[in-house]
Amino acid sequence: MKLLISNQYGAIVMALVPFIYGMLLANPVWAHIFLLLGWFSLYLMTYPFLNLFKGKNLELYKKWSVIYFAAAVIFAIPALIYNWQVLYFMFAMLPFVAVNIYFTKKKDERNLWNDLAGILIFALAGMGSYYFSDRTFDEKILWVAIYPTLFFIGTTLYVKSMMRERKNPRYFWASVIFHLLCALIFVVSQQFILALAFVPGLVRAVYLPTKKLSVMQVGLIEFAITAVFFILLLVATL
């Protein structure tokens, strides 16, 4: 049986990076494996679940929504036995899920506000991953929320400047200015490795929109830049 998965592979990376960062920044425990599997199953569920609101192929999307939800529940049981309070982070996601549903109903999934809602959901997943092992809510949990979120907002603006909004100069300048501000903020705060983490994104935001690249090329470059960002983020904060 072939899995029903969205072809937005970049979103998978966006869903996993904050979670893994939160786990590594905290004290990883065995139950994190089940929490990760449960979270990933929930993420996979979002594709068929949101498509239910389009009113087409309902049986197919109902089937896969149930399959992924069941998998999420099964994987989550050991994690919830370890720390059930992580559910609070899931409840905090619900308003942003409502935003996703709203834009899906309007057939406007590419709306920037919809993208931002998704990024905030991923940030909450990262916060939950950090909190999970020791029930710690401190300054570092804000790092988990803020640093990947800034990076992925920049990524979203850049991708729009390369693809659907290529002819809209506002997205190009928004992408460049946002990346530049992120780098400058960390330079001013003397967090130089964090500033360096945003430099590859800034370079590609300035340079690549002038080039004609295929969707695959854009995706591969983005994967490499995300990997560099993540490595430098770990070096700067672990």
Curated annotation (Swiss-Prot):
The chain crosses the membrane at residues 19-39, 64-84, 85-105, 112-132, 141-161, 176-196, 218-238. Disulfide bonds: none annotated. It comes from the Bacteria. It is found in: Cell membrane. GO terms for cellular component: plasma membrane. Keywords: Cell membrane, Membrane, Transmembrane, Transmembrane helix. Pfam families: YwiC. It is a multi-pass membrane protein. To B.subtilis YwiC. This is Uncharacterized protein HI_1626.
